[in-house]
Regions:
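Intrinsically disordered, low-complexity, charged/polar segments
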Residues: 52-76
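Small side chains
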Residues: 3, 14-15, 30, 34, ...
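Short aromatic-glycine-enriched beta-strand elements
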Residues: 42-48
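Mixed-charge, Lys/Arg-rich low-complexity intrinsically disordered regions
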Residues: 1-23
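Short beta-strand-centered aromatic/proline hotspots
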Residues: 23-39
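A short, structured loop/turn motif at beta-sheet edges
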Residues: 5-7, 39-42
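Short, cysteine-centered beta-strand-loop-beta hairpins and adjacent loop/turn segments enriched
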Residues: 19-26, 55-59
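A short beta-strand signature
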Residues: 32-35, 48-54
Length: 76
């Protein structure tokens, strides 16, 4: 699936690795659930407004997710 297959307003779940730490040299894993609020089809990315109560270890309230690097499901 690519960014063209996902619509703004859809609810998705995604698991992905992200960089963290003082210099960005550490890696952690997050599982998020939320609504797609923007998308960049040319970079195969979507911006997700994260539901923090339904998510685990989210790096922020809004997260850009690279669809080719994440395990994701469309919940709608």
């Amino acid at each position: 699936m690519t960014g063209k297959d996902i619509q703004i307003g859809q609810n998705i779940s995604a698991g992905f690795f992200f960089r963290c730490g003082h210099y960005g040299d550490d890696v952690d894993y997050a599982i998020i659930t939320g609504v797609v609020i923007r998308k960049l089809e040319c970079y195969n990315q979507v911006l997700v407004d994260v539901d923090l109560e339904q998510s685990f270890n989210s790096p922020g309230k809004s997260v850009w997710v690279r669809l080719d690097k994440a395990d994701f499901n469309i919940n709608n």
